[in-house]
Amino acid sequence: MPNRAFKQSNIRNFSIIAHIDHGKSTLSDRLIQHCGGLTDREMAEQVLDSMDLERERGITIKAQSVTLYYTAKDGETYQLNFIDTPGHVDFSYEVSRSLAGCEGALLVVDAAQGVEAQTLANCYTAIEMDLEVVPVLNKIDLPQADAMGVAQEIEDIVGIEAVDAVQCSAKTGLGIDDVLERIVRQIPPPKGEPEEPLQALIIDSWFDNYQGVVSLVRVRNGTLRAGEKMTVMSTGQSYQIDKVGYFDPKPHETGILHTGEVGYVISGIKDILGAPVGDTLTNTKSPAKEPVPGFKKVKPQVYAGMFPISSEDYESFRDALGKLSLNDASLFYEPENSAALGFGFRCGFLGMLHMEIIQERLEREYDIDLITTAPTVVYEVEKTDGSIVKVDNPVNLPAVNDIETIYEPIVEANILVPQEFLGNVITLCVDKRGVQTAMAYHGKQVAVTYELPMAEVVMDFFDRLKSTSRGYASLDYQFKKFEPADMVRVDILINGDRVDALAMITHRDHAEGRGRMLVDKMRELIPRQMFDIAIQATIGNHVIARSTVKQLRKNVTAKCYGGDISRKKKLLQKQKEGKKRMKNLGNVEVPQEAFLAVLKVGK
C-alpha cells in the first residue's frame, strides 16, 4: 500500500464512456483485477454494478468510483481514480456528473459493432468539458472484429485521432497493460492548489441506514481531513467530518483526501437533502469564496402519477422517494391526489427507462406495490387572457374555451443506423410526426437527425426503433424547443363519470385511434356487472368512441313454459326496471390492470 501523501503529478482521474454492451463493466473489472484491487475469489462479474437491477439488466445506472495503484513501466507508481459512468440515454445526467470529477475519459468502442449514438453524445459531453479522450477498441478477440474499420469510423463520426487506438479484449485480459500505460501517458494530472481553501465537488450521495449520508467527492483545491468541520455551500449547513477514505472497491478509511483525489466523506448528515449532488464542500474555518462550477441541473422530461396500492404505504412511499432522490438528483416528486387512486405523488423522470428503474427499485428495495399512470411530457399552454401555464398532468389542462394555443416540446433526435434499416427508421419517424433535418453517410452507418415531438419519443419510440432495426439503430436526443401543436385531452367516462387517472393528452390526428383502442381495452378489463356499463372516450363534450360492457342477466322466464306471452313480458319488464334502479345506484370498480392499459396504448 503506497504512502498516502501522493504526488499530485502521479494522480490520474478518468471515466469510461461506452454504449450499453460494449464491455465497459468488464473492462473496469479487468483494470481492478490487474491492479490488485480485489483477489480473484472476490472478483464478482461487474464489481461496480452493485445494484441487483444493474446486474440483471446488464446496464450501469449509478455512478461508482474505485481507486487503484499501478506501477508503470517508467518505475513510478500512479494513483488511478476511476469513476464509472452509465451508458443509457436516460442516464446522461449521471454521465456529466461523473465526467465533472475527471481529467480524461476512455472511449470504449466494440470493435465488432462500431460507434453508437449514445457513445457519441457522451463523448461530445466529455470534449465540451475539456477532457482528454482516449479511444480503446474492445472485444478484439471476436472473429468479426474489424479494428481498422472501426478506428476509421471513430475518426469520421467522432472526429478524434484513432489510428493508434489501444486494442484490447476485456474478456481475455489481452492488452490491459497497454490501456493502463495509455491512461498514465495521455491523461493529464489534476490541477488544483493544495494550499488554497478546500473545495470538494459532490459527485454522488447515497443514504446508509447506519452512517447517514455518504458522499463521493472530488477534491479540487485544499485538503479534506477527518475531524474538521465542513460547510455545504448551497445550504450553509456545517457538519463534523467523521470518516474520509476511498474505495478500492471496498471502503478504505484514510482520514485525509489530498488535492485531485476522489473518495468518500461521511459526516453524520441525517437529513436526506443535506448534501445535494453537484454541490461544493468547503472548510468552515477558512471557506472558499465560490463553489466549484458544477454541472448542468437537469429537468425531468416525463411525468407520471405514482400511487401506492394500499393507502397504509403512503408514509413509507414518501420516505422511499426521499432516499431515492438523494441518490438520484434527477428524480422530482410532489404530492398528488386522485379521485380514482387516492393519495400519491406526481413524479418527474428523465425518460421511460428511468421511470421503470425507479418503479422497480421502489418495489424491490422498499417493498411498495405501486400503480403508475400514463406518462406525459410538459406542455406550455397560452390561455386566452395571454398568460402561459406549464402543464404536466392532463387533469390540469385548462378548459377548451380558455386555451389560445398549446405548445408541445420538440426534441432533436440523432439516430445512427446501418444502411439496410434506414427505410424502416424513416417510416417510423414519419409515423411519429417527425421532420428530418439532416442525413450523413459514414461507411456502413447512416446518421439521421429528426425533430420529433417528445410525447411520441416518450411513449414507445425506443422499443419500436430497436425492433424495426433488429436492435442495430441507436438513439440520442435532447430537448430543442416548444412548438404550437393541435393537442387535445381525451377523457374516459365510465357510466358518465370521468376517471381522472385515465385522461391523456394527444394529437388530434391520433385522438380517435387511441381513444378507440383504450375504450376497447377497458371493455376487456372491466368485469361484467348486473347492469350495462358504458365506456366513452370524449374530447370536451364530443364523444369519439364508445363501447359497452354487457350486463349479466338471470333467465327470469325459465319457469314459464307455454302459457301466455304477457306473463313473460311482465317478468322481463320487472327485471328491466330492477336493472335501471341498480344502474342509478351502482358504482363500477375499475380494476388495476385497466390503469396499466393506458401505458400500452399506441404500441
From Swiss-Prot:
Binding locations of GTP: 21-26, 138-141
Question: Keywords for this entry?
Answer: Cell inner membrane, Cell membrane, GTP-binding, Hydrolase, Membrane, Nucleotide-binding, Protein biosynthesis
Question: Where does the protein end up?
Answer: Cell inner membrane
Q: Name one GO biological process term.
A: positive regulation of translation
Positions of disulphide bridges? none
Q: What is the E.C. number?
A: 3.6.5.n1
Q: Does the keyword Cell membrane apply?
A: yes
GO MF term set: GTP binding; GTPase activity; guanosine tetraphosphate binding; ribosome binding; translation elongation factor activity
Catalytic activity reported: GTP + H2O = GDP + phosphate + H(+)
UniProt-listed CDD domains: EF4_II, EF4_III, LepA, lepA_C
Q: The tr-type G domain covers which part of the protein? A: 9-191
**SMART domains per record:** EFG_C
Top-level lineage group: Bacteria
Where is the major localization of this protein? membrane
**Its topology with respect to the membrane?**
Peripheral membrane protein
Q: Which InterPro entries match?
A: EF-4 (IPR006297), EFG_III/V (IPR035647), EFG_V-like (IPR000640), G_TR_CS (IPR031157), LepA_C_sf (IPR038363), LepA_CTD (IPR013842), LepA_IV (IPR035654), P-loop_NTPase (IPR027417)
Name a single GO cellular component.
plasma membrane
Belongs to which family? Belongs to the TRAFAC class translation factor GTPase superfamily. Classic translation factor GTPase family. LepA subfamily.
Functional summary from the UniProt entry: Required for accurate and efficient protein synthesis under certain stress conditions. May act as a fidelity factor of the translation reaction, by catalyzing a one-codon backward translocation of tRNAs on improperly translocated ribosomes. Back-translocation proceeds from a post-translocation (POST) complex to a pre-translocation (PRE) complex, thus giving elongation factor G a second chance to translocate the tRNAs correctly. Binds to ribosomes in a GTP-dependent manner.
Q: Which NCBIfam families match?
A: lepA, small_GTP
What is the designated name of this protein? Elongation factor 4
Q: Provide the organism lineage as a comma list.
A: Bacteria, Pseudomonadati, Pseudomonadota, Gammaproteobacteria, Alteromonadales
